[in-house]
Amino acid sequence: MNSELFSPYTIKDVTLKNRIVMSPMCMYSSENEDGQVTNFHLIHYGTRAAGQVGLVMIEATAVLPEGRISNKDLGIWDDSLIEGLHKTTTFIHDNGAKAAIQLAHAGRKAELETDALAPSAVPFNETMKIPVEMSIHQIKNTILAFQQAAIRSKQAGFDVIEIHGAHGYLINEFLSPLSNKRTDEYGGSPENRYRFLREIIDSINEVWNGPLFVRISANDYHPDGLTVQDYVQYTKWMKEQGVDLIDCSSGAVVPARIDVYPGYQVQYAKHIKEHANIATGAVGLITTGAQAEQILNNNEADLIFIGRELLRNPYFPRIAANELGFELEEPHQYERAPGKISTNK
């Protein structure tokens, strides 16, 4: 039986063997608090590759040490961090998948002893510290850090880079009027609020010619915040700059009540795909092969990002293939266990 979920997908010169992407999820497992990859990361990501995920995306990886969410985040701010990341991509490639990395800066959501940096001195909520408004020098230094992180990503063997522009972290904070109260060239109008991301994309394009994704929060869930229609314009600009795919998440720039249900964010991937004419990834409570297949068949997205379901079951692609009646090519080491496996949870 044919399956869209298990059909290949090519972006630039990178071909994924199927449309399943491991969504970036922080593991907070750099135990020495130095940003280094540990044995856990190798097993964690290598297992999902062996489980037949098409693209394994490494968790949010900090471009600067002060840009970590926690002290145990992975980092890519120094050349000494390349070796561990290269071991990770080797694990992933050796097990048949492509490797991606999400480059990130936590902004005002950094829970470190040092000052949190943000576009404006506006805290996320009343329990978090008031961030320091970034100077122009700090903004330019952060843009340079993203560029240097892209260079290190290439040296580490990654096939795809994703810029983390979602979930209330630094780039999202610049984009949203709820967190960006600046009156200079990086605040005010949509064009000015986009400037920080624009300059990051431009800087990465100078050193990286592989597939480039951006994760967005397509809805602020606040009457004075951004909606998916605002992101249509933003993503049109991203496409003009050469971004290849928009990973469509939502929320978390301010505290908000969100109506969560299976596939609740697919609508954003569909809207951006249709109105900005750019490839999209759907993410959020996608838990079955049939659900993922329907999203692709309905042309609502191009890739399916799976998060928690891959934490519950690293071999989710096998279950999805069984569900869809698709014969999945197994690693030769597992050929002694042919046939269907249980889909019971």
UniProtKB/Swiss-Prot annotation:
It catalyses: A + NADPH + H(+) = AH2 + NADP(+). The keyword Ligase does not apply. Substrate binds at Y28, H164, G165, A166, H167. GO terms for biological process: response to toxic substance. It comes from the Bacteria. GO terms for molecular function: FMN binding; NADP binding; NADPH dehydrogenase activity. Gene3D superfamilies: Aldolase class I (3.20.20.70). Pfam families: Oxidored_FMN. Disulfide bonds: none annotated. Its cofactor is FMN. FMN binds at S23, P24, M25, C26, A60, Q102, R215, G307, R308. Keywords: Detoxification, Flavoprotein, FMN, NADP, Oxidoreductase. Its EC number is 1.6.99.1. NCBIfam families: PRK13523.1 (NF010047). Belongs to the NADH:flavin oxidoreductase/NADH oxidase family. NamA subfamily. PANTHER family: NADPH DEHYDROGENASE C23G7.10C-RELATED. Catalyzes the reduction of the double bond of an array of alpha,beta-unsaturated aldehydes and ketones. It also reduces the nitro group of nitroester and nitroaromatic compounds. It could have a role in detoxification processes. Homotetramer. This is NADPH dehydrogenase. It comes from Bacillus anthracis.
